[in-house]
Each structure stands twice: as C-alpha cells, then as structure tokens.
Amino acid sequence: MMQLRKFFENPKKAFCFFCFAIIILFTAYRSVNDFFYGGGYQWQETRQTANMAEEVSLSELYGADYEIYPFGINDSTAAVFCTESIGDTMKEEKNFLRKIVLYSMKSGKNIQEILLDHRYFGCSICDYEGGTDILFYTRDRLEQNCLLWFRWDKQKNQMIQILDKTIENPFSDYTLIAEGKSAALISYSAEKNELQSISEEEARPFLKLVGNEIMDLQVESNGTDILVMEKLAEKAQFRIYRNGRSFRTRPLAENEDCYSMHLLKNGALLYLQIEDAGISEKRLVWWPYHGDEVTISTGMLYRGISDHQNTALWNEFSQSGAKLHRVYIDEKKCIHEVLDLEPDYAALPQITLYDRKNRTANIFLNDFQKMGMIPLS
C-alpha cells in the first residue's frame, strides 16, 4: 500500500496511469460494443435510373428455340447454359439441357461449348473466390436421376466436369455450397443427423446438426458459416452455424413462410411471406449476426436474388413500378441502394452479379433472349 501511495504521489506517474486506464476502458467498451452490435447497419438509400450499357442478342447467338440462363460472370466472360422445351402442352412438355457455353463479352464469340442431352429439372449455383460451380439435376436416357457437376475456373477460363453421378434420393437432398475457396456438394443424412460432403467415391461428415427429427432442410453458406432452415415436426426455424457450432437461431412464425434465404458476410437476407388477418405480404428481412432484424422491402414480388459473400442484388415488382435493389456489407454497415428501372427492363427473369468484387454492374436476361450489363454507382 505504501508503494502504491508513493506511486500516486508522483504527478507524472499518476497522469500516465490515468491515461492508460482510459485507453483500456475505451478498448474494452469498443470490444463489447462490437460484440453485441457488430452486425449493425446504416441505411444509405440512393435512387437513380438504371441504363443498359451493353446488350447481346442471345437468340442470334444460340437460336430462338433455346432458353439461355447466365450462371457466372467476370469482366470479360459470361458462362451460360441452354435448355430446350419439347412438347405442345404443359403436360407433354419436356425440358432438355442442351449445352454449356463460355461466351467472350469482348470478342462476341464462344470460348468453350459443352454439348449435353439430359432431361433438365433445375440447378444449384455456387459462386466463390476464384470460380463458379453449377450442379444440374437431370435424368439420363435410361430415365435415371443424375447429378452433373461442372466448375468454371475463372483463372483458366475453362469449364471442367467434376461429377457425373446417378442417385436414388430426391434432387432436393443435394445442393452446392461454398467451402472456403472451393465448393462442396452437400447432402442431408437423416439417419446420422448430419450434412455430408458427397464425392464420386464416398460421403464424408461435413456438419453435425443440432436438434432431432428434422423433416426438411435448406442450406446456404457464405464460405465460412452455414445457414440452415430446419422444418421440425411442430415448428420451423433458421439456424446459423459458425466453426461447426450453433451460433444463432430465429424461429419461423406460424404466419411466415420462407421463399429463399441468402447468407452474406455478417447476416442473412430472408425472403418471407407473411399472412396477417387474411392479407398476404411478401417481405425481405435483414437478419444480422448481432442486433435486431430489419425489414428492407415489402414489394409485391422479388426475382433473381443473387448473392455473393457481401453483396445481394434483386429485382422488385410493386404497383409503383419495378426497381433494382442492392444490399452490400461495407465493414460493419449494411447499405441499401435502389435503382429505378426503365420500362423496357421492368421484367427481368434472372439477375446475376457481375464484377462481384467491385460491385460495378450486373448482367441479366430480358425475356430469355437478351443479355446485358447495367453499371452500378
């Protein structure tokens, strides 16, 4: 005690101690504040008219019989796949996956073309640093359900086939998610209550799930964390896993239904339908890792939601017109931007982010016949 008293009797030492204590307290406050409110956001809503910068006629490139879907973009190349519908009526109509194409935006020519002949039932697209993977749900000539897994290596600018696998389980049991700087093919094992990573040779444990008797499961990833929607016997809920452990949960209310979910850098976008007193409303909700959720938009319909790590882009339809929305994470802020669409581009069937790192433009299809770019501020 005597030594401590002598220490404080020295004005210089006492002043230094006081300053040091202030720094420690301030650092501790910032750490605690970041822990609880690190998922905070600020609305920085801007409005402008979206103008088309470049436009390509897909029907001239690939023929009017095909429907063309973009699934990956960089500054010089578009990756698309082509399907063809055969049959006169909806009951007899069959959809076939015909080709996968890498198209040069600079030269206007195909870089690579892979021809296929499978019945097409949908796909799962996974974008990550360095590449884009696409999983096709198909049926072969023997009427067997097949998974076709392709990888677009953006550095080599080439499509590579990863997997051609016949399956017995439903297509809905399989999806692609980002896993670090690559992608993983994930399947849910109800017997072991875990997600499994599927390869040609084996299925290995990927994530042990919390809870039992999961009836249905949807999975999303931002490359490091996993978002699942669990449908249990009596309820449904969203759960985020971090480092293999349950990190945060959000119950799905009885009057809520989930159309889609998108896990970004420090939060999730949940596209929900709310039933209230006989009135149905579609709602896009931002659910941050820390802090309270916020409703971003309540338009009539959202289409083409595309997400990648820290950016989500989607098209909104409402009675007041069509708009292009962008939400992106800048450090610890969630910034929301709105672009009013010209009437010619008011009905965009599909939107894919372009130049994802710099968030400068997007590419889309107009009536599945045109492909173009819209610069973003």
Label for each model-derived stretch:
Residues 346-377:
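Blade-level signature of beta-propeller repeat domains, shared across WD40, Kelch, NHL, RCC1
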Residues 64-72, 118-127, 168-179, 211-220, ...:
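Repeated scaffold domains used in trafficking and secretory/extracellular systems
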